[in-house]
A protein has these predicted regions:
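Structural motif
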Residues: 121-122
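Accessory terminal and edge-of-domain segments that mediate assembly/interaction
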Residues: 1-106, 110-118, 132-271
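Short, ordered loop/turn segments at secondary-structure junctions
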Residues: 127-129
């Protein structure tokens, strides 16, 4: 275990030279789990392999039960090797966010170091942008973008229909990891946030599959990702119900509510 309370479990031994011009896409649990579902979907579509897990002593103090098997809450890095050897992809997600601001800094700082060691040149973080429901286009959610580099931001805006995030705070690891990676290692980062109903900020049971899919489509177009699976508006409701059932079971297993009081929860609206 490291001095920061993080235990590393490696599944592959690798050298930095094993990966070709890699990028990193991350999505941690947050509002409506928009970023996390997008990453989970990418993991399945790319058949990504697990590189390493991280067990952290600031994650919820409970065990996850899946098919009668116990596991600890964790963050994980997976990888996909481009068969054309042009650009490999690292994917990062987690079962939970840290319970304290200090914990979020510790895990974000640690993951930014791992990303740097993997010779990543670009970090793409995915999350939610809560807005009043009356302002949401019912067909396609808008995507808002910010970046650690102004030139990168302008180039991205020029070739997409995304909106700039003028001001605000991106709370949680989705915003902190690319920010720390830029400050410490001069790695470029982009944060893409799909708009969702702001009721999700006070109702943790809400998921927004449409927003997650919109992020996936943007990734596919902007970064030429090999995403083949198509979702239709007709089956979104069924998929959302299945996703919600899994989320409810995970929350029940973790039983986090007894460890976080109402005031702390109000301060921790992770995007």
């Amino acid at each position: 275990m490291t001095d920061s309370g993080i235990r590393i479990i490696k599944h592959y031994d690798f050298n930095e030279e094993d990966f070709n011009d890699p990028i990193c896409i991350l999505g941690m649990p947050g509002i409506a789990d928009i970023g996390k579902f997008a990453i989970d979907s990418l993991i399945g579509q790319l058949d990504a392999k697990n590189l390493m897990d991280f067990i952290f002593d600031d994650y919820p103090a409970g065990a996850i039960v899946d098919d009668s098997l116990l596991s600890a809450p964790k963050a994980e890095i997976l990888f996909w090797k481009d068969p054309e050897q042009k650009r490999d992809i690292f994917l990062i997600t987690a079962d939970a966010q840290s319970l304290t601001p200090k914990g979020i800094y510790r895990i974000s700082n640690f993951l930014s170091e791992i990303i740097f060691q993997c010779k990543v040149k670009l970090i793409i973080a995915l999350g939610a942008y809560p807005v009043n429901s009356r302002k949401i286009d019912s067909k396609i959610p808008k995507i808002y973008v910010s970046s650690t580099d102004r030139d990168l931001l302008q180039k991205f805006l020029a070739r997409t229909n995304c909106n700039k995030i003028q001001k605000g705070v991106i709370i949680g690891a989705n915003g902190l990891i690319p920010t720390l990676a830029k400050a410490r290692f001069n790695l470029d980062g982009i944060v893409l946030l799909a708009e969702t109903d702001n009721i999700a900020m006070v109702n943790e049971d809400i998921t927004d599959l449409k927003a997650s899919i919109t992020l996936l489509e943007m990734l596919k177009k902007s970064f030429t990702l090999p995403i083949k699976k198509k979702y239709s508006l007709d089956n979104i409701e069924d998929i959302t119900k299945n996703l919600q059932n899994k989320r409810d079971q995970l929350e029940k297993d973790l039983n986090t509510f007894q460890f976080v009081d109402t005031e702390d929860k109000r301060k921790s609206l992770y995007i």
